[in-house]
């Protein structure tokens, strides 16, 4: 994770540093550093329904093809998400669950996505997945 950034910064970094088409995520949720705390930024991948580049290594690339990539700005090995980030994340996930009939059991962190290559500690040891799931009830 990175303590600063926003969708535009990640877009540039993914283009220049990784030689991707652009930002790999469908949504970026700010932490107050380079966008508002809790601000949900949809990216071109969401607007154009482009295949993501947020979770490699899954069989058939299913997580990028069929999954929705949501990035929270922050390094959650060293800090916790802000309360506004968590509120926005829960709001966004509830919307996606309802709109696309996604069961709560299909909501994963990057490192717990079935079939992912496992070479990441994302979303970080301080990311409260249990809290997110309880916020969805």
Tell what function each PLM region has.
Residues 11-14, 26, 52-60, 110:
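Histidine-centered active-site/metal-ligand motif
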Residues 29-47, 58-137:
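Basic/polar, cationic surfaces and motifs that engage anionic cell-wall
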Residues 1-49:
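Short, conserved "active-site rim" segments that organize catalytic pockets and cofactor/ligand binding
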């Amino acid at each position: 994770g990175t303590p600063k950034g926003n969708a535009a910064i990640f877009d540039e970094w993914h283009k220049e540093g990784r030689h991707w088409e652009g930002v790999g995520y469908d949504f970026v949720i700010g932490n107050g550093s380079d966008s508002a705390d809790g601000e949900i930024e949809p990216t071109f991948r969401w607007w154009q329904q482009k295949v993501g580049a947020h979770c490699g290594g899954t069989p058939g690339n299913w997580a990028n093809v069929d999954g929705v990539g949501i990035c929270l700005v922050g390094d959650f090995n060293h800090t916790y998400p802000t309360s506004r980030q968590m509120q926005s994340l829960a709001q966004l996930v509830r919307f996606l669950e309802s709109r696309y009939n996604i069961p709560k059991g299909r909501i994963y962190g990057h490192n717990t996505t079935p079939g992912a290559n496992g070479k990441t500690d994302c979303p970080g040891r301080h990311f409260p997945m249990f809290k997110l799931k309880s916020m969805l009830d």
